[in-house]
Structures are given as structure tokens and as C-alpha cells.
Amino acid sequence: TAGNTGIGLTLIANAKGYHSVIVMPETQTKEKKDLLKSMGADLRLVPAKPYKDPGNYVKYSKTLADEYIQKTNGNAIWANQFDNIANMLGHYNSTGKEILEQTEGKIDAFICSSGTGGTIAGVGKALKEFNKDIKIILADPKGSALYNYIKSKELIMEGSSITEGIGSSRVTANFAEATIDDAYSIDDKDAIPLIFKLIKNEGLNLGTSSGINIAGAIKLGKEIGPGKIIVTILCDLADRYKSKLFNKELLKEKDIPIPEWL
């Protein structure tokens, strides 16, 4: 995990009396690492490596799970976050239906980013079953290959982003379930200032994935015009990224406008 799903799984494991082992790339923020440790997770940090490398965090977690399964006589499971479509089904059975209830079915488009891929796939499936004309759009950070995959069926990565846990160099089993009409490639220079604006003007303390989602929703709104209902997901908090989001040196280096209060 890049952290957030691991945090959720650790809380569930604690409540169920299970031991949780969380594998994460060492490049993720200190805040997420500290939170996992404080909740009692057995945190294993590994160097960030491409998916094809056997040392990649997903591959390593599978190797580790196999060892635990053998050691415990089958009394362990590999959550397999990215390719376990329980994630997509969870959003299909809950989030998608909740959106339809709250909008009374009057929704023109849904847009969000993809990390595991379950949100866009599950919500999209529920919405398309209700009305096939509802547009499902991907908001993809720079440095991810999914934008080009939707546009041309080629996994090509361009640029970079300070966001974590969204974007991918591959098509996960969850993402493969998605029916996506279009995609936007979102620059940090458009997304991050929106996070600061929402803190100041709306009292919303949101994280980087939410910033990408909101920037995508605004772009979509400008494209399809007034009088439409667009839904996105505010899925993370700024607290988990403060060492990046509120790091003046990093923002300056990435040419992202620095909020006046920093």
C-alpha cells in the first residue's frame, strides 16, 4: 500500500484481533509511516522499484504473505490491495449507490483519480447501470501512465507529481473493471493551489488526491458547461502529507505557488 488503505486495513485488523503486516515504499510521507506504527502495524519499508522488479512493494508483500501462510499453516491472507476486486465491489455496493441517492439520480458525470482503481471502477459501474449516459472521467496526475492508457491504450508515463497513492504504471485488476469515457492529465500546479484555497476559504483540510480530483472536476465543469451535476470524491486529508504539502522548499523547487501563510 502507499499508506491509506493500509491504515484502514490495520484498524480493521485491530478490531478483529488480527496481526497486520503492512508493506510500503520508503518514499511515502513520514506522517503515514508514523500513523501506521502508532496503530500497531508491523510496518515493512522497501525501496521504491518498478512493478516488474521482484523487489517492488506489491511483489514483496506477496512473497512475505506466502511465508506467513506457510509458517502459520494457512492462518494468514494476502490482502492483495490492487488486484483484489473486493475494493471495486465495495464501491459498487456502497459509494455508487450513495451518490445516486444523494443526487436523486440527477448526475451528469463522475470524475476521480485512480490508485487501487476500485473507486472509479465500482462507482462507475453503479452509475452506468443506472444510466449509461452518465460520463465517467479519470483525473490522472502527471507521472502516471493511466491517462495515456485511456487515450491510446498505451502505458506511457510523462512528467511527475508530488501526489502519493494515485496514478499507476500498470492496469490493476480493479482498474480493469472500469468503464471510462475520457481522461484528463492534471498538473500539480493546478491541483495543489486548490488545496490551499479550500483550506483558506472553505475550512476543508484536504490531501493531494482530493486536489487532483477537484482540479479534474473544475476542468470537466468548464468543458460541459453550466447546469450540470458533477460528482467527485474528497478522499484524503492534508495531515498525511504535511511534510510535502507545506514544505516551502519543495513547493518552490516544483514551481508550485506557496500559500501566503507559510
Task: Give the residues covered by each predicted segment.
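Buried hydrophobic positions in well-ordered alpha/beta secondary-structure cores of metabolic enzymes
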Residues: 3, 13, 36, 79, ...
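Alpha-helix C-terminal capping segments
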Residues: 6-19, 37-39, 122-131, 215-225
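Generic beta-sheet signal
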Residues: 23, 46, 81, 137-139, ...
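Phosphate-binding loop/pocket of nucleotide- and phosphate-handling active sites
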Residues: 215-262
